[in-house]
Amino acid sequence: MLLYTKELVIPRPRPGLLRFRNNPRGIKFREKLCNSFAHSNIHGMQHVFGEQHLWQRCLWLAIVLGAVITGFSLYTVLMHRHSEQLLVSLIETTQLPVYHIDFPAVAVCPWNHFNWQRAPSAFIRFLPRHPNAELRETFRQLLASMDIMNFSNFNRIRILTKRNLTGISYLKMTDLMNFMTYRCDELFVADSCVFDETPYDCCKLFVREQTVKGQCLVFNSMISENSRKKHLINQFYPHKLSTAGEDSGLKFTINASYSFMNNIDALTPFGMNLMIKEPRQWSNEMMYHLYPDTENFVAVHPLVTETSPNTYEMSPKKRRCYFDDEKNPTFQNTSLTYNRENCLVVCLHLVVWKTCQCSLPAFLPPIDGVPECGINDAQCLGNNSDIFTYVKMGDQEKYINDSRQGHFCDCPDNCNSRLYEMSLNVRKLDYPKNSTDQLIKAQVYYGQRVMTKIITKLKYTNIDLLANFGGIISLYIGASVMSFIELLFVLGKLMWGFIRDARIKLKEYTK
């Protein structure tokens, strides 16, 4: 009979409840972490937690940490490049039809503003009854000074300060200029105006407007009240044009006869300033001179520049331009559309107001509530003409040693603007035999049917940042969106287990 000892049999449990050894909670959490990442699809992590040997796990951990640090270092560089907000200008097209924009406004400004045939009527209209010889001579010198005056030569009117101005101190320059300046029918030859190969009455095409050169006759503008009325009754105003070349745009002829126009004592010959500007632009410093007995051909090559809306979050100072719905602090209390030229004239008018405590609506956009400069203000205007006629821009003093006086205007461009490149060809005008006329002929037309459009936009957008971030993470970590979702799921699962164990432990502790 075999004898079984207690060493050969399975020990029987003691009576009562069985007791199991509790594993430490830290070990349990670590096991869950290892188990989760050992079966994870996140590159490298399965090796960190799944390899048998310690040195292999350390090696893979160093590789994973190095890849993560390198990837996020490059991402930091990428973020810095994105935060710089670099702008790039690209040619969007060179074949944009010219009818996409308005035909430019064309202003004709005489060198001598006044028709001296109306001088006797001006004496009767503006002087008191029975003026003495001194007052008549003072008024005549005033007319002679204003005849050749524009905003760049106020010092000409300063000579009047040596005379007694008491008798004419009440006069307003605007009223006097409106009475004495040329009428449309006095300048243009009848039936000489043609636009888009269609004849027009010149006085229906051209309207009187104020510019920095004084009162001019302007075609296709939106500045004056009469011009804006045209837009209300004609949806196609300002005019557009689809053709190019000579005889396709605007043609007009000016009567340059001296018999009734010029002042006898004037030293300035008769001539015209031709100004090409945007329809909603007050004035333009770039002008051409039109001389009698010449035929002038002005070819306009427009260039359209636009700024992408993705730059809207940038500050105008960094963008260096303003959108239409943004306000420049120096461009206020005006109904003009914002562009650089309009900003400059508004800024200039504010300088005149602060310097001489009056305004000049005859040359600059009006300022509500500010009195108009009178004859008594001529000395202030003349003494400060060097300030008014020179504009200092930006930080030019860092680069230019300029001791001249002037005024400072911060006027960036409009983010969506146009630039007109022009070329002028002049030839001598041939008259019919025995003709005694003196004429100035001019044509303004597009040089080509198409134009170039340049668009400025951010070089690196949020989409570029996201795409480059995805490329860096894929290259160094081999991760994707699904990898991040899986990582968040694993961490969330572990966090939930940790919270649940903590709650159980808290309940056991409170019992």
From Swiss-Prot:
GO terms for cellular component: membrane; plasma membrane; sodium channel complex. Expressed in the tracheal system. Expressed in the taste-sensing terminal organ of the larval head. In adults, expressed in hairs on the tibia, femur and wing margin, but not in hairs on the tarsi of the leg. The chain crosses the membrane at residues 59-79, 471-491. The keyword Transmembrane applies. It is a multi-pass membrane protein. It is found in: Membrane. Its main location: membrane. The keyword Cell membrane does not apply. One of its GO terms (biological process) is salt aversion. GO terms for molecular function: ligand-gated sodium channel activity; mechanosensitive monoatomic cation channel activity; pH-gated monoatomic ion channel activity; sodium channel activity. Keywords: Ion channel, Ion transport, Membrane, Sodium, Sodium channel, Sodium transport, Transmembrane, Transmembrane helix, Transport. Pfam families: ASC (PF00858). Belongs to the amiloride-sensitive sodium channel (TC 1.A.6) family. Part of a complex that plays a role in tracheal liquid clearance. In both larvae and adults, contributes to the behavioral response to salt. Probable role in sodium transport. This is Pickpocket protein 19. It comes from Drosophila melanogaster. The lineage of its organism: Eukaryota, Metazoa, Ecdysozoa, Arthropoda, Hexapoda. The gene is ppk19.
